[in-house]
Structure formats: structure tokens, C-alpha cells
């Protein structure tokens, strides 16, 4: 199992939002590069970065920060937030980012997403955010009519091999993981699923690994000290 500690960026700072609400933001650090180095020191091989400014308004406000983190080396980095064009994908891949995550655009322009998956292969992933089982879009403000699990099946059929699946109701709440959901997702043969949202105990991570979840993203639980990254990596990372 791959463990992705998360760095969410807003205005160059390391922050966490509560359930995607920009008005419920906590700042955890002023130096994202130092946070990334701390993760490496704890044994991290992977890093999940979200550009919250990009997600909100499509800007590249955190581009230089992400470039600096990538330049340090030592990590497989995936980036999401505001990636809606092939030009943006290329910009990130040219920086040394390993994988780009498509979000709302994957729902709104499925043909584009399929084309990018064909063009860039495993360097493209899709972030599927769901509430009450249905796909949410536009910063989690709207629910679509499609079940998240069904959308994941469509993505796999279109050539997308990796999905980062976030249960919004659990995100930033440290309420624990919706294990039944990830059991259902694990039954989609050939799809690599990354669990995201509310992961807050080592027991959950062991359970996720046991049911075949490919990776997990750790956010708030790391920053509050509820989970120790070194301990987690030693226990569950392949």
C-alpha cells in the first residue's frame, strides 16, 4: 500500500480545510518545502499536493511553491486543483510532478479526460469526490446524478487506471474511513483506488490494505498528531 501525506496549499501556506469549506481553514505551516522534507525524513516516498487556489479560481498562485517542492526531489508527487487543460498538465509534468489529478473537469468533459488518459497513461488520475454516494463537483457545492462507484467504472473503461476517492462527509473531520465504500470500490478489477477523507487510525489503514485499497492519503490526522507518519509507513507501506 502506498501512503501519501498531503500538503494543501493556499497562498503559499500549508493549510487544511474542513469538508472543503474555504471559510473553515486552519494554517499548519508557512514553509511547504520544509513540511515535504519532514515527510521524507519520516520515510515518505509519495506526496499528495492540492492547489486550493487553483481549485477555486483556476490560477497558478502556488505554482512556484510546487516547483520548489518538486525540485527538492526524493518524492513521487501527484498534484490536483485547477487542472482543466492539457497545457496545465504539461506544465506540471515538466516541473517533475509524477501525476496530475483531474477533478471537476472529469465530470464535465469526460471525453477530454479519456483523451488525457490515453495520451499520458498512468501520469493521469481522477479525483472522485462524493457525498452520500453521489459525485460532487464545483468545489463540492453541487451533486451530480451519478453514483461515485458507477463513475469509477466508467473511468476505468475510458482508460483511467487510478482514482482518488474522497468521501466528503469524512474529509477533515477525523471521523474515520467509510470502509464499506472502499470494499465496493476494491471489487472494480484493474482500478487502483486511493482512499481519501477522514483516515485517522492505523487500524483503518490496515483494514484498507487488507481489502485491496492501493493507496491512502493522510491529511489532518498527521497535522494534529493523531497519526505518526513514520509509524504508519513502517506498518502498512509496501
Language-model segments: what does each one mean?
Residues 8, 39, 47, 92, ...:
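Conserved, mostly hydrophobic/aromatic
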Residues 28-40, 84-90, 144-154, 205:
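Short, acidic/polar
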Residues 83, 94-112, 167, 197-201, ...:
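Glycine-rich phosphate-binding active-site loops on the catalytic face of alpha/beta enzymes
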Residues 46-64, 104, 109, 165-175:
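Glycine-rich, proline-tolerant flexible connector loops at the mouths of alpha/beta enzymes
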Residues 15, 19-23, 90-93, 97-171:
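Conserved anion-binding
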Residues 48-51, 78, 101-102, 125, ...:
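Conserved beta-strand positions in the central sheet of alpha/beta enzyme cores
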Residues 73, 77-99, 180-215:
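Catalytic cores of alpha/beta
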Residues 60-67, 141-150, 175-183:
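Charged helix-capping and loop-helix junction motifs
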Amino acid at each position: 500500500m502506498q501512503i501519501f501525506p498531503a500538503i494543501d496549499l493556499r497562498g503559499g501556506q500549508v493549510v487544511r480545510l474542513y469538508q472543503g469549506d474555504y471559510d473553515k481553514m486552519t494554517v499548519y505551516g508557512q514553509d511547504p518545502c520544509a513540511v515535504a522534507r519532514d515527510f521524507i525524513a519520516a520515510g515518505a516516498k509519495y506526496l499528495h499536493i492540492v492547489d486550493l487556489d487553483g481549485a477555486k479560481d483556476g490560477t497558478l498562485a502556488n505554482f512556484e511553491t510546487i516547483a520548489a517542492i518538486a525540485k527538492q526531489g526524493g518524492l513521487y508527487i501527484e498534484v490536483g486543483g485547477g487542472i482543466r487543460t492539457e497545457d496545465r498538465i504539461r506544465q506540471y509534468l515538466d516541473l517533475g510532478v509524477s501525476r496530475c489529478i483531474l477533478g471537476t473537469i472529469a465530470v464535465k468533459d469526460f471525453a477530454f479526460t479519456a483523451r488525457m488518459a490515453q495520451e499520458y497513461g498512468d501520469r493521469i488520475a481522477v479525483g472522485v469526490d462524493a457525498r452520500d454516494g453521489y459525485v460532487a463537483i464545483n468545489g463540492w457545492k453541487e451533486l451530480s446524478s451519478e453514483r461515485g462507484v458507477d463513475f469509477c467504472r466508467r473511468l476505468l473503461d475510458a482508460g483511467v487506471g487510478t482514482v482518488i476517492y474522497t468521501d466528503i462527509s469524512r474529509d477533515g473531520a477525523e471521523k474515520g474511513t467509510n470502509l464499506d465504500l472502499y470494499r465496493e470500490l476494491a471489487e472494480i478489477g484493474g482500478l487502483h483506488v486511493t482512499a481519501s477523507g477522514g483516515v485517522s487510525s492505523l487500524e483503518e489503514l490496515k483494514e484498507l490494505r487488507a481489502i485491496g485499497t492501493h493507496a491512502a492519503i493522510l491529511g489532518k490526522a498527521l497535522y494534529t498528531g493523531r497519526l505518526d507518519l513514520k509509524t504508519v509507513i513502517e506498518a502498512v507501506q509496501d
